[in-house]
Swiss-Prot record:
InterPro entries: CmoA, Methyltransf_25, SAM-dependent_MTases_sf
Broad EC category: transferase
Official protein name in the record: Carboxy-S-adenosyl-L-methionine synthase
Pfam families: Methyltransf_25 (PF13649)
Keywords: S-adenosyl-L-methionine, Transferase
Physiological role: Catalyzes the conversion of S-adenosyl-L-methionine (SAM) to carboxy-S-adenosyl-L-methionine (Cx-SAM).
């Protein structure tokens, strides 16, 4: 396996700019791409481990849905102290799954990890104490989000937690534009050019459709979660928890 490289996928002009996909090219540079594109990503990954340590129950299942290269899975695996837990990491990208398995296998642990190549909408969720959707739900078509969240709720044990990280939109137009501009400033500060920012935005706008924080909270509450709150936010990116 080649080491992860620097993200320059959108550095040169692309004549026919298709929709963004999590293919081999993206998998090879994903760690660099996500660190330079998502403000606070490392903090979120670290805190997912902390939350898993608090909420993982003995002999339960932990799900990382849309696991990409396994950063959240590894954070939880390092943190979980409970006996008999199993982590099920799922992604529909063959390139991501292949590299995820290599990353997972590079670390020894008493907590087994099953890496599954599948559509997260088709995964059975049962006996779960922790479920993670780390910047994943936003890539599902909006009409499938409720169904997946209902399935997660049904598969969680009472007292279990859903950790939901997403990019957000805002109803206040001035605030929305300011937070987008601050995010672009963040990307510029991390070495992305105007061309890269523009081309990435065009490629991803048809496949990533963010919701507002209020939409997330309303949906989770209607499904039955007893406690929902944003625990981290930086610009228009953040993470929420929802407790059953």
């Amino acid at each position: 396996m080649r080491m992860a490289g620097q993200d320059n996928i959108f550095a040169a002009p692309i004549e026919k700019l298709g929709d963004f996909t999590f293919d081999q090219k993206v998998a090879e540079v994903f760690p660099d791409m996500i660190q330079r594109s998502v403000p606070g990503y490392s903090n979120i990954i670290s805190a997912i481990g902390m939350l898993a340590e608090r909420f993982a129950k003995p002999h339960s299942k932990i799900y990382d849905l849309g696991c990409s290269l396994g950063a959240a899975t590894l954070s939880m695996r390092r943190s979980i102290q409970q006996e008999g837990c199993e982590i099920i990491a799922v992604d529909n990208s063959a390139a991501m799954v292949e590299r995820c398995r290599l990353h997972i296998d590079a670390y020894r642990s008493d907590t087994p990890v099953q890496v599954v190549e599948a559509d997260i909408r088709n995964i059975d969720i049962a006996d779960a104490s922790v479920v993670v959707l780390n910047f994943t739900l936003q890539f599902l078509v909006p009409e499938d989000r409720q169904m997946l969240l209902e399935k997660i709720y049904a598969g969680l044990r009472p007292g279990g937690i859903l950790i939901l990280s997403e990019k957000y939109i805002f109803d206040d137009e001035q605030a929305h534009e300011l937070l987008i501009n601050l995010h672009h400033d963040f990307k510029r500060a991390n070495g992305y050019s105007e061309l890269e920012i523009s081309q990435k935005r065009s490629a991803i706008e048809n496949v990533m459709r963010p919701d507002s924080i209020d939409t997330h909270k309303k949906r989770l509450t209607e499904i039955g979660f007893s406690s929902t709150e944003v625990w981290f936010q930086c610009f228009n990116f953040g993470s929420m928890f929802a407790i059953k």
